Amino acid sequence: NRRYKMAYFDFAQDKKNEYPGLCVAFSADGIRWEKYSRAPLLKSSYGSYGQAVPFDSDLDQPWDVPLSMSDAVDVIYDPRRKVYALYGKMWIDGPDGGMYWKHGMGRTESENFVDWKTPELLCVPDESDPAHVEFHTSPVFFYQDVYFCLNQILNRDVQGGVIDIELGISRDGINWHRPFRSHFFLSRSGHDQFDGGSIFTNSTPVILDDEIRFYYGGYSQGATGADDYNHVSGVGLAVLQRDRFAGLTPVSLSDQSTLRKPLQNIGQITLKPIILANWDQIFLNADAS
């Protein structure tokens, strides 16, 4: 019985070599698990930037797998494509062609949780991001016909690699947009808190009638370079009023140049043209008190 499914990364023997990669396990009750006999199902890769250039024939390093998924992934069931989709960190090559430069957002899918397609690279840090920023991993969940990503933004230039959470959105789970770069969805707490250094999200928020609960893990220091073994960790909870992933907050005085005259204590929103020919109702999620 494969009612419960688990995806994890581990080292496994494949012919003559031992490789890291994607492994799976199944359970009938969620308590007793059995590892799937074939592993790894997808080979991963490891190393340091400046090592092998992909497909260099002078090197014999079978563990160098270009554009492979790495060791932090989250899996969901994609109701649109009717497949299991696994999102996570994926190695991207540097400007000089060397491997193991940074991590971007990768994806692979499977119909049976065993046979996984070649991973695709979906989204990467770009010229609008600081130089030392990359994605630690990118958990995705499907809600209200939209794909949301709780992207873990890793900044290696601060405190051994701190992580804050950026909200990403997609209409198809493949093409991703990052419209909220200037405001983190979940930010680290103060330096004396368990989540003052890094926040780790997942793909399973708890949806209730009036709120959405996001449980997360936290480190008091950076996630990749902290050598202080006195740092603490824990589990935190962030609560969002239901469906308020983003919003507008009024100001007491609006005096921008597009107005004929300043508006005092009046909330006004101007939207782009929207075609409403086939719609009967519009729902506004707002507090007008």
Enumerate the language-model features and the residues they cover:
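Carbohydrate-active catalytic/glycan-binding domains of CAZyme proteins
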Residues: 1-289
